[in-house]
């Protein structure tokens, strides 16, 4: 039953001894102790390799240094207790099951800290405490997608079929309608005898918004943007209706055109001849009078100061154009326009009375550039003919 040394009784090879007391509970009748462990699966003797050792699973050593990417596994709700194998004979070694302590969880099975999506969908997929959230729970239900799709399609259909909030009461015209209206406008405008400028002035007279001839021309040529043509079409349509039903539209356009030209151009100032002579005498005395002198001249001649000032400006420009400047330094001397341009350093040929002299030899001068501040000194003339004196 037990060894004389007082130790535990010997156990067969590959079996652990019983964890109970060394003496059986039934007494000292020498009955064999009952096996308290779960039975293990058996393997045939020929299939067991004695050289292959079954090692224990290592204890958990904290989180792994580098997590390996593993494919997602289906969620299983299993029991943490080891499963029991069918009864087997005690002649072979045990096949160790999973250890009772929990091992490190794979990275793909970690629980999400918050709900995957807010709203009622999160309440439809509650995460059980202590278990990882299954990947299937992260996918929205087909009913939710169908609802979203149906709502989006219904809203799109409503926006296409109905009117938008900022579209206005009437629909925007299409490109074909704008093109046809531009053709009709041009044809009726020519038939009624209006120009493009008349149309722009009439729009300003009737509706307070004037347009240029270029704008009307671009509208008829379809060269404006679609948005601008849509804005301009109602005004032109109203003008066209007024022009067809009103007889004095041409007179109204002509009056507006006259007023516009009067606003743009000032009346031309006319100065009498005797006043011009007086101004000319003042100009010979002083080319550029001061503001005080201009005021005095205007008061003497009963003219406006701006008229006198503009006359002096125009007179100075006229003198520059005709090269007839009058000033203190010129003292009324006019320049001779027919005087030959001869450099002052060269001798001027003198014609003798009664007989002719030989022509002077040609003189070649070095080129003088405009960028130079001082001209180069004159070189002595080189005669091209051998004239004896």
Curated annotation (Swiss-Prot):
UniProt DNA-binding residue ranges: 264-323
InterPro entries: HD, Homeobox_CS, Homeodomain-like_sf, Lambda_DNA-bd_dom_sf, POU, POU_dom, POU_domain_TF
Domain POU-specific: 170-244
Acidic residues composition-biased segments: 167-177
Keywords: Activator, DNA-binding, Homeobox, Nucleus, Transcription, Transcription regulation
Induction entry: Strongly down-regulated during embryonic stem cell differentiation induced either by retinoic acid treatment, or by cell adhesion prevention leading to embryoid body formation.
Record-level GO cellular component terms: nucleoplasm; nucleus
Keyword Secreted annotated: no
Main localization, broad class: nucleus
Biased composition (Low complexity): 1-18, 145-165
Compartments where located: Nucleus
SMART domains: HOX (SM00389), POU (SM00352)
PROSITE patterns: HOMEOBOX_1, HOMEOBOX_2, POU_1, POU_2, POU_3
Region (Disordered): 1-88, 145-177
Pfam families for the chain: Homeodomain, Pou
Alphabetical list of Gene3D superfamilies matching this protein: Homeodomain-like (1.10.10.60), lambda repressor-like DNA-binding domains (1.10.260.40)
GO annotation terms (biological process): positive regulation of stem cell population maintenance; regulation of transcription by RNA polymerase II
GO molecular function, one term: DNA-binding transcription factor activity, RNA polymerase II-specific
Its biological purpose: Required for the maintenance of pluripotency and self-renewal of embryonic stem cells. Transcriptional activator that binds the DNA consensus sequence 5'-ATGCAAAT-3'.
UniProt family annotation: Belongs to the POU transcription factor family.
Protein name in UniProt: POU domain, class 5, transcription factor 3
Source species: Gallus gallus (Chicken)
């Amino acid at each position: 039953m037990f060894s004389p040394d007082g130790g535990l009784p010997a156990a067969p090879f590959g079996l652990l001894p019983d964890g109970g007391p060394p003496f059986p509970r039934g007494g000292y009748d020498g009955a064999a102790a009952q096996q308290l462990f779960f039975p293990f699966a058996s393997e045939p003797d020929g299939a067991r390799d004695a050289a292959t050792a079954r090692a224990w699973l290592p204890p958990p050593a904290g989180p792994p240094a580098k997590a390996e990417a593993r494919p997602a596994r289906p969620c299983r709700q299993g029991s943490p207790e080891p499963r029991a194998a069918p009864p087997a004979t005690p002649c072979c070694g045990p096949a160790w099951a999973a250890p009772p302590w929990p091992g490190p969880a794979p990275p793909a099975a970690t629980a999400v800290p918050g709900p995957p999506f807010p709203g009622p969908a999160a309440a439809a997929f509650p995460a059980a405490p202590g278990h990882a959230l299954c990947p299937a729970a992260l996918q929205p239900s087909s009913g939710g997608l169908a609802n979203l799709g149906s709502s989006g399609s219904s809203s799109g259909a409503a926006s296409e079929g109905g009117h938008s909030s900022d579209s206005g009461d009437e629909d925007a015209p299409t490109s074909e309608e704008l093109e046809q209206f531009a053709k009709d406008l041009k044809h009726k405008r020519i038939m009624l005898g209006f120009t493009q400028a008349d149309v722009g002035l009439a729009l300003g007279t009737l509706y307070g918004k004037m347009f240029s001839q270029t704008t009307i021309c671009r509208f008829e040529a379809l060269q404006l943007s679609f948005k601008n043509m849509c804005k301009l079409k109602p005004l032109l349509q109203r003008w066209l209706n007024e022009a067809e039903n009103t007889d004095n539209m041409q007179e109204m356009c002509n009056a507006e055109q006259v007023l516009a030209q009067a606003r743009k151009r000032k009346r031309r100032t006319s100065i009498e001849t005797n006043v011009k002579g007086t101004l000319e005498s003042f100009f010979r005395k002083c080319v550029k009078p001061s503001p005080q002198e201009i005021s005095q001249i205007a008061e003497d001649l009963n003219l406006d100061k701006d008229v006198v000032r503009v006359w002096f400006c125009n007179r100075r420009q006229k003198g520059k154009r005709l090269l007839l400047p009058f000033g203190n330094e010129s003292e009324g001397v006019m320049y001779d326009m027919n005087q030959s341009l001869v450099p002052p350093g060269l001798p001027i040929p003198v014609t003798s009375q009664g007989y002719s002299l030989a022509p002077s030899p040609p003189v070649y001068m070095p080129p003088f550039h405009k960028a130079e501040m001082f001209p180069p000194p004159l070189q002595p003339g080189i005669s091209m003919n051998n004239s004896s004196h």
